Regions:
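C-terminal motif of bacterial Sec signal peptides marking the signal peptidase cleavage site
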Residues: 4-5
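Short, conserved catalytic or interaction motifs in soluble domains
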Residues: 8
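Non-catalytic cap/lid and distal C-terminal segments of serine-dependent acyl enzymes
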Residues: 15, 19, 31-283
């Protein structure tokens, strides 16, 4: 490849006058960085909680305990500190569906949605064999050693006695009182609904007189004015008073029957919620 150079002959010099732009200048836009948008958190508007049915394995009973678990509307599995929670035990010859049938969880939905009570978790286990008392049955041990740890490991519940309650109706109330006074370091609140106590259970209540005041559970007792076990319930209340146990006793119109308990499930929830608030404020 050859490069050939050519030169112009007798050419006139070319003037080098700079060109001037006479057009109107346009404003120059400077890019402005866009602000990072913060995602708007989703607002939960649910008005109903959810009910789970789970089988919790137990070593004491060598079988599982079928358990209904109520999670409140807008349940947050990562809630800081966890929800206060309540174990509710059914009566003799019934199942763990009893509290559902009485309307307990429907009442919880209404009271939580209206902000009358704080959201809480409710645990309703099934006692299959209900004939033995605490000396013969290991149901109480299974609750303490298997059910309670399972709930605290798998659900967003508070792990302090001030936000842990146990209650029940009739025989279930017997278990609640038994566990509440045998393990006052675990449960800060006990509910006994239409509850004549297990034989010998008054001794555990009398023993509470020697506990520091902050270690004694708050107790709710109620019964119908026509309850066939009313006298035994009154003996229970007298024992609480003599032992210096903080309690509230309500006598409503009614008998020892489902229509009585269903009429007062909202009252029970209000009381448990107030008790949680009281214990938390005293910490």
């Amino acid at each position: 490849l050859f490069l050939v150079s050519c030169a112009a002959v007798n050419s006139s010099p070319i003037s080098t006058v700079a060109a001037t732009d006479t057009s109107t200048p346009h404003p120059t836009s400077t890019p402005v960085p866009q602000a990072t948008r913060t995602p708007t958190p989703l607002v939960c508007t649910a008005t109903q909680g959810s009910i789970l049915n789970v089988d919790i394995p137990t070593q004491k009973l060598n079988r599982s305990i079928n358990t209904n678990i109520y999670l409140p509307p807008c349940y947050d599995p990562k809630k800081e500190g966890g929800y206060p929670w309540l174990i509710m035990l059914h009566g003799q010859a019934a199942t763990n569906a009893q509290w559902l049938e009485l309307g307990l969880t429907n009442a919880a939905d209404d009271l939580i949605t209206s902000k009358e009570i704080q959201p809480l978790v409710i645990v309703m286990p099934f006692e299959v064999t209900w004939t033995p008392g605490p000396r013969e049955s290991q149901f109480d041990e299974a609750l303490m050693e298997d059910v309670l740890p399972h709930i605290e490991e798998n659900y967003a519940v508070c792990k302090e006695r001030t936000c842990r309650a146990i209650g029940g109706l009739s025989r279930g109330g017997n278990w609640a009182v038994h566990l509440g006074f045998v393990s006052p370091e675990v449960f800060g609140i006990v509910g006994a609904h239409s509850t004549p106590l297990f034989y010998g259970e008054l001794w555990n209540i009398q023993a509470a007189a020697g506990l520091p005041p902050e270690s004694i559970p708050l107790v709710l007792v109620d019964a119908g004015d026509k309850d066939a076990e009313k006298e035994k319930v009154q003996e229970f209340v007298t024992a609480l008073k003599d032992a210096g146990v903080p309690y509230q006793f309500f006598e409503f119109e009614g008998r020892h029957e489902p229509s009585y308990w269903s009429a007062h499930v909202a009252d029970y929830l209000r009381w448990y919620a107030q008790a949680f608030t009281r214990l938390q404020s005293e910490k």
